[in-house]
């Protein structure tokens, strides 16, 4: 490795502490430690949040800064080492005692100007060492960039690697909620409850097996990319004089094949919305008419600074979208209430309740602990349902009306797919003990 040749103490600062070689695309963290960008990200094998600095273990949440100045220093030092090597006595042509400043691409060797004119090499392609180094590095970096972009894209799917656990927890939570809902039905529907739970468990086990297969495919694909990328990176860090004489055709061939592999997307698990007999009929006994105040705002941050999306950073929102926010004219602190919100014309929306008062002076600011909402957001080519508890909920997106059931005494709110008379999800009893106000927000594109 090129780091083995470091002698100048100043040049020791150009060595990555992870790969123990000269920096490639150096970055630095807030704690001050510097690494190759690839070394830093690939060292986080579990892709945990927050991620930690490999040196001091301070969290950095995948936030780092490209060190342009250090990158320039690295380039200068590498060229300096090459010239030192070319000017050394050991490097001179044995036959002509001249410097070897010409590269023969056919033979992959360095030549002096007299050897390059010889009959042996007369039909070969020659160029100066500077040009050869530049072309070789450009080709290496081109392959590295192609694989790195694929690895970065795969980071959008890192949650898939832990989705099996999230799925299992989501199903267990849903099972408890379903039991609680059936327990409130009158008369108790024990047989229907057991059938519902059995169906849920069967779907859960089937999906879990598919998730594991999907996970294995993604991990295998990622490991293939990482293996080839590490080979390219190791080669790019070698001294220029060694890099030139290497035959990289096989490595470049494998790099192209790896870059063309189908990108596994991972499956998107969803639980079917099973009907609960008598659910909507029971909730309609608490039906109230909710009057809303309306406000139209432009831009996401001005509407929802509490940002539920913190649970899912990869969710994309268009800055040109318009968010219409509505909140109930009346707050509730006692009793049970049920209302429905028509969402058939909205693809992205938020429904639920939030702590009263809604307005704090003239500010719309709220903290996540003030909010008891169900939010539907677009994520790439599909939609997800999330709450501030439990993150993503793997339930089919409701089409049409969503029912909201508020139990002030119980301190929770539930959401219902009206068309299917099925439970979407429910907050746990005792989640809040305060007056709350109905809330609704929709996105207009």
Curated annotation (Swiss-Prot):
Pfam families: SPRY (PF00622), zf-C3HC4 (PF00097)
B30.2/SPRY domain sequence ranges: 270-445
A GO molecular-function annotation: zinc ion binding
Zinc finger (RING-type) stretch: 16-57
UniProt entry tagged with the keyword Metal-binding: yes
Residue spans, zinc finger B box-type: 88-129
InterPro entries hit by this protein: B30.2/SPRY, B30.2/SPRY_sf, Butyrophylin_SPRY, ConA-like_dom_sf, SPRY_dom, TRIM/RBCC, Znf_B-box, Znf_C3HC4_RING-type
Superkingdom of origin organism: Eukaryota
Keyword Ligase carried by entry: no
UniProt-annotated binding residues for Zn(2+): 93, 96, 115, 121
UniProt keywords, alphabetically: Metal-binding, Zinc, Zinc-finger
Family: Belongs to the TRIM/RBCC family.
Name by which UniProt lists this protein: Tripartite motif-containing protein 43A
Record lineage: Eukaryota, Metazoa, Chordata, Craniata, Vertebrata
